[in-house]
Amino acid sequence: MATSPYPLVAPEIAGSPSRPRIVAALSGGVDSSTVAAILHEQGYAVEGVTLWLMRGKGQCCTDGLVDAAAICEQLGIPHHIVDSRELFQANIVDYLVAGYADGITPLPCSQCNKLVKFGPLLTYARETLGISQIATGHYARVRFNSELGRYQLLRAVDRQKDQSYFLYDLSQEHLAHSLFPLGNYTKAQTRQIAARYGLVTANKPESQDLCLIETYGSMRNFLDQHLGQRPGEIVDTQGRVLGSHQGIHHYTVGQRKGLGIASSRPLYVVRIDAAMNRVVVGEREEATQAEAWVRQVNWVSTPAPDEPLAVEVQVRYRTPAVPATLIPESPERVKLQFAEPQFGVTPGQAAVWYHGDLLLGGGILERPSP
């Protein structure tokens, strides 16, 4: 094994007598590039794989393909491009458009990780390349709990960059064959490592959280292109008409800015009524709720509980986790009772619950009852 100044990635694999083979998922960004470089230096037989998701400019598209190829050439490793455009269209683009048209705010990144990236990437690695292990640039950690006989997902050391929230829907099969080498590093350390290797992506700007924004300029542009204008009413919680809108897909629960209505007090989106093509607004308290139902639950790190469970729950990527009691109705549906009422709990987004750094599970927030 080659000498490396960085901790061994999966030493149980690295300690094998022959060079262990691994696929590095390369987006063309600094994070995935650094992963490939670390693994290569530590003696892994690395092969880069880039998923071609969309046409157009952006890290996830043409520019990403070019930069990923440049990294592989720099490291002297093979590079493979997998045409995943149809898969991305069906599972992400169509999913987003349908969700916004239905008045919810979908979370495409967790869907993409499960259905477009990890599953298909593992299949390609095994069936085409004969490789059973993949590594990605996600900021998260995985460990094996021998008592439970399960792989477990944990937050990254760098809480500001932690991406475990987007990985809650992965399976045991995914975790068993995936490595996250950056989980123990901060973003600043990653850039330092990339600079040490002299990677061509070392100074590449940070990408958008949502790759579609890089292609379309904004989520509004993306939705307007696919849904057009669909005028309707903006009403208060009593049904009084306050103004008009050009499409419910321009709004999300908790939104205050850009409502386009005059009011003597701050108003927020309380709910979106797709059937009536209405946006319902109210005062902040009316956009606050003490509990929420969650469907399509995935218990990634632990078995589903039979009894209520004290957790810390995160209902948006950029919001802190808050104390809550989780009450299971079934393994696939739970109720969350927040210790304090929460503002802007948005249908379609993910609720993800933790014990400290350990991600227990998550699911999709349902619409509250009217």
UniProtKB/Swiss-Prot annotation:
Site features described as Interaction with tRNA, chain residue numbers: 138, 349
UniProt record, GO biological process: tRNA wobble position uridine thiolation
Purpose of the protein: Catalyzes the 2-thiolation of uridine at the wobble position (U34) of tRNA, leading to the formation of s(2)U34.
The encoding gene: mnmA
HAMAP family assigned: tRNA_thiouridyl_MnmA
Positions that bind ATP: 25-32, 51, 137
EC code(s) of this entry: 2.8.1.13
GO molecular function: ATP binding; tRNA binding; tRNA-uridine 2-sulfurtransferase activity
Catalytic activity: S-sulfanyl-L-cysteinyl-[protein] + uridine(34) in tRNA + AH2 + ATP = 2-thiouridine(34) in tRNA + L-cysteinyl-[protein] + A + AMP + diphosphate + H(+)
NCBIfam families per UniProt: PRK00143.1 (NF001138), trmU (TIGR00420)
Main location: cytoplasm
Keywords noted in UniProt: ATP-binding, Cytoplasm, Disulfide bond, Nucleotide-binding, RNA-binding, Transferase, tRNA processing, tRNA-binding
Gene3D superfamilies in alphabetical order: Adenine nucleotide alpha hydrolases-like domains (2.30.30.280), HUPs (3.40.50.620), Translation factors (2.40.30.10)
Subcellular location: Cytoplasm
Pfam families per the UniProt record, alphabetical: tRNA_Me_trans, tRNA_Me_trans_C, tRNA_Me_trans_M
Native species: Synechococcus sp. (strain JA-3-3Ab)
Renumbered residue ranges of the record's region Interaction with tRNA: 161-163, 316-317
SUPFAM superfamilies in UniProt: Adenine nucleotide alpha hydrolases-like
Entry-linked InterPro entries: MnmA-like (IPR004506), MnmA-like_C (IPR046885), MnmA-like_central (IPR046884), MnmA-like_central_sf (IPR023382), Rossmann-like_a/b/a_fold (IPR014729)
Protein name per UniProt: tRNA-specific 2-thiouridylase MnmA
